[in-house]
Amino acid sequence: MAFANFRRILRLSTFEKRRSKEYEHVRRDLDPGEVWEVVGELGDGAFGKVYKAKNKETGALAAAKVIETKNEDELEDYMVEIEILATCDHPHIVKLLGAFYWEGKLWIMIEFCPGGAVDATMLELDRGLTEPQIQVICRQMLEALHYLHSKKIIHRDLKAGNVLLTQDGDIKLADFGVSAKNVKTLQKRDSFIGTPYWMAPEVVMCETMKDTPYDYKADIWSLGITLIEMAQIEPPHHELNPMRVLLKIAKSDPPTLSCPSKWSLEFRDFLKTALDKNPETRPSAAQLLEHPFVSKVTSNRALRELVAEAKAEVLEEIEDSRDEAEDDDSSESASLPGKHKRDPSEVSQLSFDGDKPPDSSSLKTTNGPVATEKEMVNGQSDKVLDERISSDSDKLVNSHSTKTLASSGPDEGKATPGKPDIISLSGRRGSSAEGDKQPMPGSKERRSMVDRPESSHLENFPEEKLANGSLDSSAVFPGSRSKGDSDSGSTSASESMDLTISLSADLSLNRESGSISLKDSRMHNKTLKRTRKFVVDGVEVSVTTSKIISEDEKKDEEMRFLRRQELRELRLLQKEEHRNQAQLNSKHQLQLDQMLRRFEQEMTAKKKFYDTELENLERQQKQQIEKMEQDHSLRRREEAKRIRLEQERDHVKFMEQLKQKKKEVKNEVEKLPRQQRKENMKVKMDDFAQRKQTMEQDFLAKQKEDLELAMKNITAQNKKEICDKERECLNKKQQLMRDREACIWDLEERQQQEKHQLIKQQLKDQYFLQRHELLRKHEKEREQMQRYNQRMIEQLKIRQQQEKARLPKIQRSEGKTRMAMYKKSLHIHSSGSAAEQREKIKQFSQQEEKRQKAERLHQQQKHETQMKDMLAQCESNTNELQQLQNEKCHLLIEHETQKLKSLDENHNLHMKEWRDKLRPRKKALEDELNQKKREQEMFFKLSVEADEQTPASPVKHTKFIPFSSTESS
């Protein structure tokens, strides 16, 4: 179900799927086999193999990184690496010679470095680097990092396996498979990616928390860890499982050198400065270039010596120094010393994708006289097997090497700063000599180098007598278990016969510790001597390395291989997690962009709708006003016409009345006597004419006044109607504006809620992916732990079977020796008859049988106890792992809860601020609308007042015919 949800999260729509695209630096039209010829294999990694290739035209060599891809989308995972290699041009960074995509395989052709990787060189030489060599490498790495960081590139996987050596004694940084190319200078990253042992604390924290991203200073931490790795072969905490080292890095103090006294103060100060857990105070590459440890480096001679030594012809010699005192039933033949030459080793060219595991070898070269063929370490080859989960592999603790200059050189006689402590044991037999005493005459000097990177057990180691000439590993390493609890032995310390007590004590001690017999101890006294001769700057240098050959050499290789496999599996998970994270981020960004586009479209549509409504309302208003004005004009004309017609009729009536009055005046005059008629007629008619004119003027004035009043009333009524309509339209318009703003506010609120829900869901998807990836990682860790526990149990079973098979031989050998010594003792102290002696011998034999039976029972009980302890330890390892995983899951869930809570709180705060800002917006809108309403009212009021103050416009009157006296006559 969870996987289905996970697939749903990462599922993209059909139109969202990215089509195959062309990449700038990758050629698709050319078969790389036509240009390059594969001449060998350099290594393999989590994502493919690395081959040595030769250009068919120029003959130039390249490291061909071949990666099989299932589909086109996987190409995107490698484009960052190709782009970085193509754009970087620096003498200490590998160059890209070409990239091809052909038949589902991606070929990345990288500059070939003959010196190989630094970690492979250390394994080849069985020692760490000297301080001068580390100084040169550090200087050149800082220059490369300064260049990368100036290009906004974070390497994110610095380690010795990704530092390649050239033939000229320079280094080149490689493997940008997990590097990040930023867009901004101050951009930070939150991807949990890299190799655990070299991870900076801030990168480790990103496994469960993305709130504390890191920047380019994570490379500075990895640089410091790499320097410790070069000094000690292994990085700090290499004895821990990769899953536990992350917790160690996050919670522990910054790591330091295991033996600080062997290194210069400047080196220690440089590491202290670089390994600062606070990235804010951690210096940059440019600042570290000014540090005294690297500022004075001017020559790369030390690296040229290193490359020449690693590539020199090797003369191997195997010595087999067996004790002369052979057991009677020893049936194994001695191995004869043999010599053979070995071609210069093919050191691994490239740490493919950075998955080289920490190796278990901890050998270092010291300056001293050339070892002779008879030089042997007095003792046994002890390799301490750490049975805890933190164990990395068996440690080879007895080895030594010498370096001799055939001709004097500038560095002759200088002590190596990083040489390990040395235990000097003098004398073939007897007690060890004190450090300031000369060895006994005829004895040979033995040197045993013991170097444990994780702790310095040999510092201030007290000089003590070695009983019977044997050095028990438990005395050298307190608290550590001897190899297999069964592989240490003791050598007879004297050829005298008075050894009953000491021999018995030795044998019982060895049986208690599970050690092997005298004969078996001699099987481990094989010494492999490697002599390398090379010339640097005209100086011939001879380096001889000696180490004890152990049965567990294959076991070391197997442990290294298994650890490499574990890191590869972790790297694959990281890569897949990174890809899934990128896909999810891309999907989330696409969702967010789509949502924002939809929001914008919705907002635009709403605004457009209301703008259209406003336009329609204004247009409708304009049309209505125009129609009203037209109607008013028409009404005015019609009303004026009607009034004029009525006035004309009234005027006609009035004129008729005047005519009638005129007739009445004439009739009155005619009633007068004839002699008075003429004068009276004239007076009466003049008077009537005056009255008629006055009456007509008054009548016309009244008609005019009535007409003007009627027109004025009509105009006022029209204005009132238009004003009402304007008010109505303004109210509608303002209501529409209110609706528009309210809709916009509701839409804003809904969009913010929707955006919050999307971001919240995306955050849940993000943590779901993190939980999914964390559970996958935990499942892989449990699988690795189960394999580890199974290996420990199988090794214990094999060791116990070997002990069980050896015990009868030990008992037979011991029984014969004790019987011979007892008979010799009876012969020396002869008392009693032969029968008594035979009876004593019989009793002694019976006691021996009882003792041997008790030993076998003791061994069985010890094996059962060991198995119980081992099973308990395995269960403890599993429980501890489960507890760590539960803590991580709990931390992730707790962080998710806090993140969701913080997201909700921020959203609520944002909405509160938005609502607080909404009130002023509403008030501003209402103020604006009220202001427009007041302006309109003021406009109408002023218009009315203006109409009242200004005289009425002249009215076009009817063409009244003025009444005149001529007409009346």
Curated annotation (Swiss-Prot):
Lineage: Eukaryota, Metazoa, Chordata, Craniata, Vertebrata
Biased composition (Basic and acidic residues): 383-397, 443-466, 836-863
Organism: Gallus gallus (Chicken)
Location relative to the cell: Cell membrane
GO biological process terms on file: intracellular signal transduction; protein autophosphorylation; regulation of lymphocyte migration
Chain residue ranges for the region called Disordered: 317-497, 828-863, 947-969
General function of this protein: May act as a polo kinase kinase by mediating phosphorylation of PLK1.
Biased composition (Low complexity): 487-497
Gene responsible for this protein: STK10
Segments of skewed composition (Acidic residues): 317-331
Active site: 157 (proton acceptor)
Protein name: Serine/threonine-protein kinase 10
